[in-house]
Amino acid sequence: MSKFIEPSVEEIKLEKVYQDMGLSDQEYEKVCDILGRQPNFTETGIFSVMWSEHCSYKHSKPFLKQFPTSGEHVLMGPGEGAGVVDIGDNQAVVFKVESHNHPSAIEPYQGAATGVGGIIRDIVSIGARPINLLNSLRFGELDNKQNQRLLKGVVKGIGGYGNCIGIPTTAGEIEFDERYDGNPLVNAMCVGVINHDMIQKGTAKGVGNSVIYVGLKTGRDGIHGATFASEELTEESESKRPSVQIGDPFVGKKLMEATLEAITFDELVGIQDMGAAGLTSSSSEMAAKGGSGLHLRLEQVPTREPGISPYEMMLSETQERMLLVVEKGTEQKFLDLFDKHELDSAVIGEVTDTNRFVLTYDDEVYADIPVEPLADEAPVFILEGEEKNYNTSKNDYTHIDVKDTFFKLLKHPTIASKHYLYDQYDQQVGANTIIKPGLQASVVRVEGTNKAIASTIDGEARYVYNNPYEGGKMVVAEAYRNLIAVGATPLAMTDCLNYGSPEKKEIYQQLIDSTKGMAEACDILKTPVVSGNVSLYNETKGTSIFPTPVVGMVGLIENVNYLNDFEPQVGDKLYLIGDTKDDFGGSQLEKLIYGKVNHEFESLDLSSESEKGESIKTAIREGVLSHVQTVGKGGLLITLAKLSAHYGLGLKSSIDITNTQLFSETQGRYVVSVKSGKTLNIDNAIEIGLLTDSDNFKVTTPYTEISENVSDIKQIWEGAIAQCLTTQD
């Protein structure tokens, strides 16, 4: 008789306990077919988390297959803890982005902190040392106190974990819109570097080899966290606070260093982070990849308190834990290493040749499941979408007051400087950061070399909402441009697909169309997808977020010497590259004037993107350009103002466009500054101005003139978010 009080197999079926765990009737019946019997309580829980949306991608898997995943530089693509891309000299860059949206909505500090910790462990599990962190965040508007609380908590959580573990946070993006009220998006990305011969895989093979648990003792925190992340947020979500994990960055630091030492041992067979679904996913996935079985003896698992059941052990998402498979007879070597780093560890099982996932506690069997169906045979749902009717009419912007519009856009939190928030992150720890958070991609030197890794993270939610296919292309192209802007060669990307409920036809169609656009852009821009994450059911009280695919992209700088003087100077001429059109659908201007975004916009010419990108990258590396900035949210006038304010330089510009085109967000444009004495040879580059040593920012068109003090612009732009957060308290 079991020492743990749990529902019987009959009660699970009759009372439909499986539904509370997240399994549908159809899925429960499939589990019964796989087992040839009714599952017990622990087995039902295991299937529920492994077949959750968060772990199985059961609504998105068909779309992910569209993405190109191989390329000249790709060493390891989707399927492992993170993607691995060659950077030459027997070195590789390892990177991935993950979401922690639902936990951050309930417990913003811990939700964000554990999101950072989890993505770090994904990189470390490959064997790479992390070199920087990035994040992409979405919140509701800051005139709402709940959104202020969420923003403050998330930023503190990101900084609190990253700063303590000693990894710089070097880039990010934050946007605000009421569509994210109560459902913030917290996407964390980590980048690491590794030598080719140290790359690890999460595999369990070699009959008789031992399974070692290391890290924090297992508690009851985070139980069914993967299932929670696969549900819509409701008024009952607050009661699921225990599903939010608790991070410990100091143990995280010890675990990182111990893991990086362990991978130097030849006796290590495989390693995987215990992330979503905890011990269940890490162990069963390792067995599936190794074509093996596993027998875990759960009484050997280090626990925080007595009485934790097998069900709780397997579904707990206690943080700062890793699972290793090591050669039989070498266990003590690893246990001694972990003891040296003051970490709890234990041998908890072994690899078998049964292809079954067997769990015992004091010799009593609590689960006996075939490995392959558990890990690889979650049902895949192909639903029916419904095309949105796009509004092809044109809004009228002829009545706008240019100066008033300029200042309203400049101080909107989406456009305003994020330094008030980013200054809470350690951007320099490790002393390899070359370009910090600001106007373009970040750049971090590869220690001991003259190479650097450029990284960026970007999203274009309003455009994806207006036209998912074109918006999908745009988000990839935006990340590409941000890497080009620092002279990097884009190598590959990771993605985080944040959407509402796929069971709603319009949202399912958004998934179909946006991933198609993303895949096309990846193919043309030669940026294969090597890792990623899907977060669905991002809804609050029945209202969905904007469809928000986020792209993290990395690029290589072979020699950083050109960055020594890559900063705009007085006397540099300014050029605009790319055409400006009447392009306001999805723009900040449309939202400001009309309160919503629902109009079409110009399609993106991806072949032109590639050609412009190569020309600009060449001009940077040849020392012609002192600065490159992509024209983004708010349009050209806002881009020029941010350039002037960020560097404290005067600016004088004359541009032959209309007043409204000052705020157009036509894609594929760059503002570049050309060094004195240098000549720019790029087709269709138009000279538009000059950087000066005055405090004057002056932009003229045939129809208007904006003339303001740079110091005033800087004060408004840099102070807007702080003002929102302090005056509303």
From Swiss-Prot:
Transmembrane segments: none annotated. It catalyses: N(2)-formyl-N(1)-(5-phospho-beta-D-ribosyl)glycinamide + L-glutamine + ATP + H2O = 2-formamido-N(1)-(5-O-phospho-beta-D-ribosyl)acetamidine + L-glutamate + ADP + phosphate + H(+). Pfam families: AIRS, AIRS_C, FGAR-AT_linker. Its EC number is 6.3.5.3. The keyword Iron does not apply. It is found in: Cytoplasm. Keywords: ATP-binding, Cytoplasm, Ligase, Magnesium, Metal-binding, Nucleotide-binding, Purine biosynthesis. The keyword ATP-binding applies. InterPro entries: PRibForGlyAmidine_synth_PurL, PurL_linker, PurM-like_C_dom, PurM-like_C_sf, PurM-like_N, PurM-like_N_sf. One of its GO terms (molecular function) is phosphoribosylformylglycinamidine synthase activity. Pathway: Purine metabolism; IMP biosynthesis via de novo pathway; 5-amino-1-(5-phospho-D-ribosyl)imidazole from N(2)-formyl-N(1)-(5-phospho-D-ribosyl)glycinamide: step 1/2. Disulfide bonds: none annotated. CDD domains: PurL_repeat1 (cd02203), PurL_repeat2 (cd02204). Its main location: cytoplasm. Mg(2+) 1 binds at residues 98, 533. One of its GO terms (cellular component) is cytoplasm. Mg(2+) 2 binds at residues 122, 273. GO terms for biological process: 'de novo' IMP biosynthetic process. Monomer. Part of the FGAM synthase complex composed of 1 PurL, 1 PurQ and 2 PurS subunits. Part of the phosphoribosylformylglycinamidine synthase complex involved in the purines biosynthetic pathway. Catalyzes the ATP-dependent conversion of formylglycinamide ribonucleotide (FGAR) and glutamine to yield formylglycinamidine ribonucleotide (FGAM) and glutamate. The FGAM synthase complex is composed of three subunits. PurQ produces an ammonia molecule by converting glutamine to glutamate. PurL transfers the ammonia molecule to FGAR to form FGAM in an ATP-dependent manner. This is Phosphoribosylformylglycinamidine synthase subunit PurL.
